[in-house]
């Protein structure tokens, strides 16, 4: 059985922990039932019981009421610890494998709930499961709610991926414990307007509401050359550059792609920045073939 999951960018400026967008960068997993858990084509650091795919698979089969083992071959294109939802690709992949190998015992909604529980927030899990542009939130009883939103075809997106990681734990630890009412209200209003801008491809509105006050002012200090990349991108495209998830990847949105000259200027900086033009992945997690 082959399962495909997609990268995602979350937050999208002021939509902290609630907005997420699925991107056409993929991880693929070939999964089969086995006598023991065996992992192929994966770094030694992840070839153990802490592997998120295996953890998610076990969580899934526990919910179904089955105990068994799998062999998994990993073909991964989503970079780790770069703010592109790599953990969600593994978790959603493992849960989907548990479901698909046992008669599709879990619905996509159940997979989303379980994945969000494992992540602790739903902003990457939702687009990874359902695809497209999603808004999500959690209730106090750990019930997660998500809805799919439209996303403008007029927006052109590029991700800029450096050669260093930013761990989610580090990116969360740097944030304040509390915010003033004024900051909270302003950011909430911007998040609402951000959805409108992304749905309608409104670049002028996008520029106004993309200035986040909750996480970006703090997390950008963890991303060396952030200001330089932002300067080059915005001067060339007149768009906006945002931190993807917790970083270190940055994502640019405009009505046109960045020029080759500006791309080279970014790639020639100190951190071996890689530029990839990306599009929205609308399908979410896919079981490509069943055996």
Predicted segments, located by residue:
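Short beta-strand-to-loop capping motifs
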Residues: 33, 138, 162, 252-256
